[in-house]
């Protein structure tokens, strides 16, 4: 019997790490409630604020879309960026390091599984938001909309971090314009926030879903944002690879695979 090739091991690892996240969501049905109904409460708060000040109805759509994309940012922070730190605390990180497979394959499997599980929450928020608040959308270009969405996810899931999760959660909600057009911060501030992929992704998707209102609030042209997202995707994936290699080398040289006293 022949040994599996390098690529076979890679894709088996991806499927093995994606499986628990997809199946776990189905086995724990309460997660579906907490991940779909409860996030609508925060979305509803912003919707009622906009309606109280008699903002244009498109702003309700901005909030619903931002609330749905919040699911992906939180998944990146707590199910990706902090994952290896938690694995270190539970004693599993050393098993990942010595396993005869790629750490990138492990993270890719985690990302794919997380995307599938998180997409259920995001679709539920969008569907319920559209039905409850009667949001009207006008899709300008479906291929561009899908391209922006996929590139935003690719760039987001290329990011890695540890204890920065708490530090980044709320500030990113502000500077990325989750609940308002990022151009409202000013062009310079929006340009600085563009290093965060979801900033460009949200602005582009809003332009494609609410073209009339976004004509006066758009940051830059959608095609420019698509190109920037493609560059960010490649850049963050390269940085993730370098960070993983550095972490692996440091852990082996200095013995940091486990916490002290474990």
Protein language model annotation of sequence segments:
Residues 1-262:
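Hydrophobic transmembrane alpha-helices and immediately adjacent juxtamembrane helices
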């Amino acid at each position: 019997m022949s040994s599996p090739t390098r690529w076979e091991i890679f894709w088996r690892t991806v499927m093995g790490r994606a499986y628990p996240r997809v199946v776990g969501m189905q086995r724990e049905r309460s997660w579906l409630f907490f991940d779909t109904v409860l996030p609508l409460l925060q979305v509803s708060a912003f919707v009622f604020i906009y309606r109280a000040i008699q903002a244009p109805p498109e702003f309700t759509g901005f909030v619903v879309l931002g609330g749905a994309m919040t699911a992906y940012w939180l998944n990146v922070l707590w199910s990706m960026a902090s994952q290896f730190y938690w694995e270190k605390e539970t004693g599993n990180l050393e098993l990942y390091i010595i396993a005869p497979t790629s750490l990138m394959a492990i993270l890719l499997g985690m990302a794919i599984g997380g995307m599938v599980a998180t997409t259920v929450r995001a679709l539920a928020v969008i569907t319920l938001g559209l039905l409850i608040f009667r949001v009207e959308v006008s899709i300008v270009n479906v291929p561009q909309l899908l391209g922006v969405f996929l590139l935003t996810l690719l760039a987001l899931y290329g990011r890695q971090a540890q204890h920065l999760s708490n530090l980044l959660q709320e500030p990113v909600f502000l500077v990325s314009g989750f609940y308002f057009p990022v151009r409202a911060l000013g062009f310079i501030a929006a340009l600085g926030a563009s290093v965060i992929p979801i900033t460009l992704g949200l602005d582009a998707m809003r332009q494609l879903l609410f073209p009339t209102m976004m004509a006066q609030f758009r940051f830059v042209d959608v095609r420019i944002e698509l190109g920037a997202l493609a560059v960010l995707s490649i850049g963050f994936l390269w940085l993730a690879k370098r960070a993983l290699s550095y972490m692996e080398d440091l852990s082996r040289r200095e013995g940091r695979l486990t916490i002290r006293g474990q």
